[in-house]
């Protein structure tokens, strides 16, 4: 799943229609709740190292609404969200979702199945997923390739 930058209206990148990951260099991306040693933390650490920005994990993780409130009010913090993830926020938040391209960072997902599962839909799903190719250049960490 492609990721996007989510910012408030006062963030320096808020007016961008799209960004490259390299354009995030020097910025702080707030990801509260990322726990060291998890695949999610490793993904974001590798992404930050590849493109020169900082992943900020400090602060409490009280859920989506407080995260959106903080991002809306901050001129310095942004966060990452999945392109397919839908949020509802108050209109006065004026949050901005900015796609990342060249390359597009994508969350690594895996399909795990049991070899003894004969369900025909599973074979059809695997065949379908094997035909999908991204329309743009993508970035995933080396350990997920």
Where are these regions (language model features)?
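Generic structural signal for secondary-structure transition and capping sites
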Residues: 3, 29, 76, 134-137
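C-terminal effector-binding regulatory domain of bacterial HTH transcription factors
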Residues: 68, 72, 83-93, 102-145
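Hydrophobic hinge/microswitch elements
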Residues: 32-98
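Flexible hinge/capping segments at coil-to-helix
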Residues: 1-3, 7-29, 123
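Residues embedded in well-ordered beta-strands
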Residues: 4-6, 12, 78, 96, ...
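Secondary-structure junction motif
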Residues: 17, 21, 27-51, 119, ...
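Structured helix-beta-strand junction loops
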Residues: 1, 16, 26-27, 51, ...
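Short beta-strand/turn micro-motifs composed of small residues
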Residues: 7, 31-33, 81, 113-115
